[in-house]
Amino acid sequence: MHIYVDADACPVIGIVERIAKSHNIAVTLLCDTNHYLTSDYSEVVYVGAGADAVDFKLISLCEKGDLVVTQDYGVAAMALSKGAYAIHQSGKWYANENIDLMLMERHISKKARRASSKNHMKGPRKRSDKDDYNFEVSFERLVEKLLQENAGKD
């Protein structure tokens, strides 16, 4: 198992690295050239700036059984289609059973924003310590689940 992080503006990199290190799991952080990341643990891969360039690079690298951390539903859907697992920075696990609904809701919201004369919507609320805690608990559970599944294959 390998962990890939869609690292552009990802607030949970430290949590991912800490948990991955405790389980001796390799991590790759992917970001575009507009960002600068350093890590003592993870491999950092820079991808040329461009719409979805990081997303497509991440998907080209991940394989069945890998774990992808992303807030992008499209990336999650592509990862799931390759047999990888995916988790949102909120801690929500993406699954084949919920991804279609999530993509449809995203599409409907995008259409509503385009149709609205008020395009000055608020952004997301500030991330809290509780958000980090929720992600940490959920991520740890998912990692342990995947490690147990992989142990059964040996």
Q: Predicted segments — roles?
A:
Residues 2-154:
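Nuclease catalytic cores that cleave nucleic-acid phosphodiester bonds
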